[in-house]
Amino acid sequence: ALRGLGKKAKLLFSWDEFDRLRKIPANVAAVRDDMEQYIGMPYVDVPNPFGPEGTYADYFETEFTSSVSAFGIEMDYRRQAQMYRGGKYAKYVLEAVAKRKQIYDILARHRTQAPTEEERDSFYPVSIYCPRCGRDTTKIVSISDDNAVAEYQCDCGHHGTFDFRTDFNCKLNWKVDWPMRWLYEGVDFEPGGKDHATVHGSYDTSKDVSREIFGYEPPLFQGYEFIGIRGTTGKMSGSSGLNLTPEALLRIYQPEVILWLYAKTEPMKAFDFCFDEGILRQYGEFDRMLARYLNGTADDMAKGIMEACLIKGRKVEPVPMNLLVQMGCVVNFDIPRLEAVLQKNGTPYSYDQFKDRLDRARYWLEACAPDQV
């Protein structure tokens, strides 16, 4: 939209692969029962649970990037393990360590529990990954007068020193890391889940850190509601294993319909990805709005929505999804027979018109549809 207005803009997608593995998602535990040993290690150092090649981070990053091209969205990617370990953030880490008591005071303003001087003295806004066990189960016990060299101990029994000028295997705490990256990248706008948008939440706290520690005016922020999943259980969540990748969604949704769901929904209103019959309703609503757009009867809102979701180089043929499900089931998805049945039904769609939806209709019917459908 910004580029359409003649603005220079880029969409930055950050892989938080340098975060610690907190718990084992259900879908990961289902294929490997030994993953708990890696809790506390960064995702980029955790082995791939689904195969012999690459890491945990590699697997999910590759899955995402290989399917996101279907949406016609251009993104710049940042891999945080490379950024931290490459020393790109070193001067900001040093600054945060030097200003650790000021950071503590900012964090304390946004907490309900009363701060203590003992806690303030022992606070450090950074976690060191242990060179012996690879985990972040370390505690800084002292710091040099110039705030450059820390002495630390790890729960695994290892003791060591860490020079923030030359050692980079560490990561700032979230509410310091986030504003640091705003400064580094020159971020102007960033959305975030509604949990980050609460009063005294991540954004409220991070914007104060941004201004008072890094001297950077924080970006405009837009909170958004969580996305639901109908036909299964729970909200989208990476740690629960219920997350849906673009690849999984594209098995039943055309990319334009996914973009349309986002474009038509206000940020703080929820919507569901439907694995039940609700998906047929969504396709129907999409087709009706598309028809209004194409025949020139759409209002400005609908026109803007459709222009945001239609993908250059693709043409959407609005063959009714419920019709493909019903008739496809009758002829066992045999294409010549399906064309003949549609002709007799007075809906003479050809294979070229319905091929983009047919496989999705079949997959949904066989893998997702409720028993009564």
Residue map of PLM features:
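Hydrophobic transmembrane alpha-helix bundles
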Residues: 44-60, 107-127, 131-133, 255-266, ...
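A glycine- and charged-residue-rich anion-binding loop/surface
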Residues: 1-8, 67, 127, 134, ...
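N-terminal Rossmann-like or analogous alpha/beta NTP/dinucleotide-binding catalytic cores
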Residues: 1-104, 206-208
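Active-site cores that bind ATP or allylic diphosphates and position pyrophosphate for catalysis
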Residues: 73-246
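Catalytic adenosine-cofactor/nucleotide-binding cores of aminoacyl-tRNA synthetases and other
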Residues: 198, 203, 225-372
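A broad, structural surface signal
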Residues: 3, 62-69, 94-101, 105, ...
